[in-house]
Curated annotation (Swiss-Prot):
Homodimer. It catalyses: (4R,5S)-dethiobiotin + (sulfur carrier)-SH + 2 reduced [2Fe-2S]-[ferredoxin] + 2 S-adenosyl-L-methionine = (sulfur carrier)-H + biotin + 2 5'-deoxyadenosine + 2 L-methionine + 2 oxidized [2Fe-2S]-[ferredoxin]. Pathway: Cofactor biosynthesis; biotin biosynthesis; biotin from 7,8-diaminononanoate: step 2/2. This is Biotin synthase. Its EC number is 2.8.1.6. Its cofactor is [4Fe-4S] cluster; [2Fe-2S] cluster. Residues 41-271 form the Radical SAM core domain. Keywords: 2Fe-2S, 4Fe-4S, Biotin biosynthesis, Iron, Iron-sulfur, Metal-binding, S-adenosyl-L-methionine, Transferase. GO terms for biological process: biotin biosynthetic process. The gene is bioB. PROSITE patterns: RADICAL_SAM. The keyword S-adenosyl-L-methionine applies.
Length: 326
């Protein structure tokens, strides 16, 4: 591949990219994308399921699953899905066209015993369906990371959420360094990383540049970089946050693509706020994966039929290439 891989991006360089005229930024990002992916433009479809919902000990300001908040989710009893039910949903997602199945647990850290045994069984079952398997479940130990790798887990998700500078405005129950340590444990076990962030939480463009600098400074780069727009949920501290601008999400996708040429840049939460045209701009900017299905953990997502229409309008195809790799 001819795309230049760097891990030494200066903050000023990244800010300058974010400030480029949009047409110039899109041109640059598309060049990088095509250089890094000469075989053609394919969009990976990923499905996301909340296995354990609610009751999380963390206080992430954006999250309706936190026990510290008063959302509709926290008002309900905690829900834990069983292995058979999860695998049935994975099978349905595969049959609908998804290539990757992501499973989420609202935990501060992975819990040993029966819950972890069930997680391992789910991972094995998803892999047997021929899908990539991704887990997001908070912090984990070296041993847990190794056992997940042995079960066949493709990728571990642990987002940084925002910049180091803005982080203490969003969460107080886990440090930024703990997030980085979790990523390193997953990497040391041979797992690929899924790690990105969220815009629209009161951060500045400089904060967005700083988040991207941290992500691009990871060596190797995360194989998967989800770019989320805040979904402001009633009952969370960010419920009244001013809505983010769709073109700001396009800019984040484009700069993520430029900084991390070979990563899958995943268009993630908040996509319902985007018109079909804005989503096509995100694809042009370098997004090559979308979350596919009617929900993302506890928030809604565009309908499958709408996404099929999106891909058709953009003239791009979904692809099974890269299974077990990203």
């Amino acid at each position: 591949m001819s795309a230049l891989i760097r891990h030494d991006w200066d903050l000023a360089e990244i800010e300058a990219l974010l400030e480029l005229p949009l047409v110039d930024l899109l041109w640059h990002a598309q060049q990088v994308h095509r250089d890094a992916h000469p075989a053609g433009y394919h969009v990976q479809l990923a499905s996301l399921l909340s296995v354990k919902t609610g009751g999380c000990e963390e206080d992430c300001a954006y999250c309706p699953q936190s026990m510290h908040h008063s959302s509709d989710v926290t008002a309900q009893p905690e829900l834990q899905l069983q292995v058979d039910g999860v695998l049935q949903q994975a099978r349905s997602a595969r049959d609908a066209g998804a290539h990757r199945f992501c499973m989420g647990w609202a935990w501060r850290e992975i819990r040993e015993g029966a819950p972890f045994d069930a997680m391992l069984a789910m991972v094995r079952g998803v892999r047997e369906l021929g899908m990539e398997a991704c887990v997001t479940a908070g912090m984990l130990t070296d041993s847990q990371a190794e056992r997940l790798a042995q079960a066949g887990l493709t990728s571990y998700n642990h987002n940084l959420d925002t910049s180091p500078e803005h982080y203490d405005q969003i969460i107080s129950t886990r440090t930024y360094q703990e997030r980085l340590d979790t990523l390193q444990r997953a990497r040391d076990a041979g797992l690929s990383l899924c790690c990105g962030g969220i815009i629209g939480m009161g951060e500045s463009r400089r904060d967005r540049a700083s988040l991207l600098q941290v992500l691009a400074g990871l060596n190797p780069h995360p194989e998967s970089v989800p770019i989320n727009g805040l979904v402001a949920v009633e009952g969370t501290p960010l419920e009244d946050q001013e809505p983010w601008e769709p073109l700001e999400l396009v800019r984040m996708v484009a700069v993520a693509r430029i900084l991390m040429p070979e990563a899958r840049v995943r268009l993630s939460a908040g996509r319902e706020r985007l018109s079909q045209e804005a989503q096509i701009l995100c694809l042009l900017a370098g997004a090559d994966s979308i979350f596919y299905g009617d929900s993302l953990l506890t928030t809604s997502n565009p309908a499958v039929q709408a996404d099929q229409a999106l891909l058709a309008a953009a003239g791009v195809s979904s692809s099974l290439e890269g299974v077990a790799a990203a």
